[in-house]
């Protein structure tokens, strides 16, 4: 009994050992049979013809890029440059990539069309890169079983054996090559009930019968069209590379080193075959192509909202700027005080900072922009379809780096402008300080000559009185009546006659000046005489102060061109009628307001932040401008109501310019970039030519004010203007305002 039991146990153990060997032998026999059947015909491809064409194409490649049947690194680099995968490029696209096969509609220079990744099961890629089985020594351990009429299972060999069932998608064997050169196989088959699926070698293609069954099942699944599939079909490789990792753009050196090849090695045809999968993988994964159409921000409002914001924002901005003329009514009592002069100096400096900052930090970068924000309303859907990883890399890194690069360069230009302003201003202050110090040192020496100078002064005053009597018939009565009139609120803006004689007026010998200017008048000689006599002695006091009162107005006209309250002398305002002066204000300021409205309208069509930036710049430089216009009209004899009315009429052209800018920016978006460039030039001209000289040639000491106080106040205004424009430029993409009706 024990002997029988022992024999049974031995036989059982022998059967248990020999059964796996039998299975292995049957598996090997099955593989050999499959290879013999498909030796000359693999998945519909004639191997003999494929090998012949492979040799032909290799000969062509080596003939173009190699020498003596070998390919050097330089030749290989030229090959990569020719197919466009040697470096990252930006490709402009204008359509949505809803499925991967849509790349066939690209232009010829993009050359990355795909004919459906499911067709890769026919070993089309192996026809281009044969001998893939030379690197594959292992087998795919993943298997799939089917029972009854159960749908096929999708086995994924690259995700650690995890299986995902699908009832509508059936794919055949797909060869996938990553940059490291390791080959993976994605398989699917529909076995018969009760039959166990064997392991499939990645280098062994499916048989013809299996291929036909897979094709029938694929067509059947497509006809059924399962509703559970909610997104377009993608190949396994594309979904893997776009979601799980970032394909690096390999150049020639990286491709060689990643395949274990020396950079100095000479490649033959066999070694070049190993590089084919990596090259095809980079072309297929578009590793070296970046679509600039995906760089647009998803949070930009649609164009319909932008048009509504443009009209509303432009109307509000123009209205606020136009109402600045009413501010002159409030500031009339303050115009006689020193505080108003400090305020005006700060406003001029603020205008310089905002105008130049808007030109260099906003208008010029937007005029060089390669895309327009208004046609990005379809981009959020495109970003969602491409995945969050691609959207994050393209939208944030690329756009922010390119836009902020222009912003930092503009900020550097502003730094150079501010540096030169500081240098010129500080040198002027140092020179004035030295002159004042020398003047204080000479005072003790001149004390001895005080009595003699007093006597000389009396003699000169008597002589000037006699000359003025002679000159009475040759000059207008208005010049003589100027001193007898009641001083208006605006007369206090000018320095007194004593201040003019001591500081602003260049003194000359009375007889020479009288002989030169009395016969011919001073109408055409004021400016030249002022500069010709600027450096002469100040020992004598000038005699005809009325003439130099006119000269003082011309001095302010030359050095303060942007302040309209000092452009015209009192007699010019009286001689000109109210209607003529009103026409000058309406046309002159109206043209200026039209250009401002044009810039604001075009800027608001670009976006809310763009319109806000330009509106702030226009507001800051229009504030002293409108105050000057109001003062000129009041000085001409107008009432407050009339001055407000004429300023309102000139503001109407600003609304017309705003409407023109909105229409141009909305319907001709390429023209708006040119408007931005033109506006930047206008802003820079107004800031540097009109306002900076007024800052540098201030008459602070003439009014008993500190020059250093003016200096620090002007610096505060400039830096504040720079800071406002810089903040708007940096955070403009986050300034979003939507209007829903």
Swiss-Prot record:
Keyword field: Cell membrane, Cell projection, Coiled coil, Glycoprotein, Ion transport, Membrane, Phosphoprotein, Signal, Transmembrane, Transmembrane helix, Transport, Zinc, Zinc transport
Annotated TM spans: 312-332, 342-362, 410-430, 644-664, 673-693, 711-731
Sugar-modified residues: 68, 142, 226, 251, 268, 670
Mode of membrane association: Multi-pass membrane protein
UniProt GO BP: epithelial to mesenchymal transition; intracellular monoatomic cation homeostasis; intracellular zinc ion homeostasis; lymphocyte activation; T cell receptor signaling pathway; zinc ion import across plasma membrane; zinc ion transmembrane transport
Locations listed in the record: Cell membrane; Cell projection, Lamellipodium membrane; Membrane raft; Apical cell membrane
Entry coiled-coil feature ranges: 450-475
Name of the protein described by the UniProt record: Zinc transporter ZIP6
Source organism: Rattus norvegicus
